[in-house]
C-alpha cells in the first residue's frame, strides 16, 4: 500500500475496531443490495489506497471462485417428498446434509436457477467483504501498529493480571502472515530464477517445482515471523519503553470522519433492509400496509426474490 494513503494516517486501533465491526456486519441481514454496496465501497477503498486496480481484481477473482463453488453446491434439486409440504421440499444440498437426508426424497438433478444463484451470490459477497476488510487492515498498518492496537484493545485483561504483550505479538504476526508469505514468495521466486528455475502459471502441475518453491517459502516465513516477534518483544512498541522508536498516532478529524461514515453506512443499510423485512405482507400479521416488500422504496415482484428475502436472508444454513 502507498505510504501516502489516507488509511495509513488513521489510528491502528480504530482500524482494528472497524475490521471487527465489518466481521460482525458481514453476517447481519444487510440484504443483497446492502452487501453489493458495502463491497463496492471496500473495493473502491482498495483501489484508492493502492492506486492500482490489480489488488481489487484479485479480491474479485476470489469472489468469483467462491460464487462458482457455491453455485455447484446449491444447484442440486431434490426429489419431492409427497409427505411434506411444497415449501419444505424447496431445499438445497446444505439442508439435505444437515438433516442426514431423512426429511427429503433424495437428490434428483442439478439445475442452475435463480434461487441457487442468489444464495451463492450472497455467500460470495460476504466472503469478499471479509477479504477486503482484512486486506485494508493488514496493508495499511505495520506489524508494530497492529501489535500496539491489539494490546490497547485487550488492555482490560490487565485487570485480571493477564499478560497482554504475548497475545498482541501473536495476533500481530498472524495479521501480517499473508503479506509476509506474499513477499517471501516473490523473493524466493527471484532467487530461484537465478538458479534456472522459472515459474509460470502451469508450475503447480510440476511437483518438483512446487517443492522448490513452497518449502523455502515456509521455512523463510517461519524464521522471519520469529525474528519479528523477538524484535517486538525486545524493543518494538512497548509504550513504557524509553528506547522505543515508534509513537502511537493521535486521534484527529480524519479518524472521526472515517469512523462516523463507516458506522453511518452500516446503520443505514441495516435499517433499510430490516424495514423491508418487517413491512412485508404476512397473513400472520394483524397489520396491513399499502407498500409492502420494498427495498429502497422498490417493490419486489418476483416470487423467487421475495422468498429469498423473507426466508433465506442470512444464507448460512
Curated annotation (Swiss-Prot):
Pfam families with a match to the protein in the record: CbiQ
Chief location category: membrane
Regions that span the bilayer: 18-38, 58-78, 92-112, 130-150, 159-179, 202-222, 252-272
GO CC terms of this entry: plasma membrane
Keyword Lipoprotein set for record: no
Keyword annotations: Cell membrane, Membrane, Transmembrane, Transmembrane helix
Keyword Membrane set for record: yes
Membrane topology: Multi-pass membrane protein
Protein location: Cell membrane
Family recorded in the similarity comment: Belongs to the CbiQ family.
PANTHER family to which the protein is assigned, alphabetical: PROTEIN ABCI12, CHLOROPLASTIC (PTHR33514:SF13)
Protein name: Uncharacterized protein MG302
Species the sequence originates in: Mycoplasma genitalium (strain ATCC 33530 / DSM 19775 / NCTC 10195 / G37)
Amino acid at each position: 500500500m502507498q505510504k501516502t494513503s489516507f488509511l495509513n494516517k488513521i489510528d491502528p486501533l480504530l482500524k482494528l475496531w472497524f475490521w471487527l465491526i465489518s466481521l460482525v456486519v458481514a453476517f447481519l441481514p444487510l440484504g443483497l443490495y446492502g452487501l453489493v454496496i458495502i463491497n463496492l465501497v471496500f473495493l473502491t477503498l482498495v483501489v484508492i489506497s493502492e492506486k492500482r486496480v490489480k489488488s481489487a481484481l484479485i479480491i474479485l477473482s476470489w469472489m468469483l471462485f467462491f460464487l462458482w463453488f457455491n453455485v455447484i453446491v446449491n444447484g442440486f434439486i431434490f426429489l419431492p417428498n409427497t409427505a411434506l409440504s411444497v415449501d419444505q421440499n424447496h431445499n438445497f444440498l446444505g439442508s439435505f446434509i444437515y438433516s442426514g437426508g431423512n426429511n427429503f426424497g433424495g437428490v434428483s438433478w442439478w439445475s442452475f436457477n435463480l434461487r441457487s444463484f442468489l444464495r451463492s451470490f450472497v455467500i460470495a459477497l460476504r466472503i469478499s467483504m471479509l477479504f477486503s476488510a482484512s486486506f485494508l487492515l493488514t496493508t495499511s498498518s505495520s506489524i508494530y501498529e497492529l501489535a500496539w492496537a491489539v494490546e490497547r484493545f485487550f488492555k482490560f485483561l490487565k485487570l485480571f493480571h493477564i499478560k497482554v504483550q504475548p497475545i498482541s505479538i501473536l495476533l500481530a504476526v498472524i495479521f501480517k502472515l499473508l503479506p509476509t508469505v506474499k513477499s517471501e514468495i516473490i523473493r524466493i521466486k527471484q532467487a530461484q530464477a537465478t538458479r534456472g528455475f522459472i515459474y509460470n502459471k502451469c508450475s503447480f502441475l510440476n511437483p518438483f517445482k512446487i517443492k522448490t518453491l513452497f518449502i523455502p517459502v515456509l521455512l523463510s516465513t517461519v524464521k522471519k515471523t520469529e525474528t519479528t516477534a523477538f524484535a517486538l518483544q525486545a524493543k518494538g512498541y512497548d509504550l513504557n519503553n524509553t528506547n522505543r522508536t515508534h509513537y502511537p498516532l493521535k486521534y484527529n478529524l480524519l479518524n472521526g470522519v472515517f469512523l462516523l461514515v463507516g458506522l453511518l453506512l452500516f446503520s443505514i443499510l441495516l435499517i433499510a433492509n430490516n424495514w423491508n423485512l418487517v413491512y412485508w405482507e404476512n397473513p400472520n400479521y394483524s397489520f396491513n400496509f399499502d407498500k409492502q416488500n420494498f427495498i429502497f422504496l422498490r417493490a419486489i415482484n418476483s416470487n423467487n426474490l421475495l422468498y429469498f428475502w423473507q426466508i433465506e436472508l442470512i444464507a448460512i444454513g
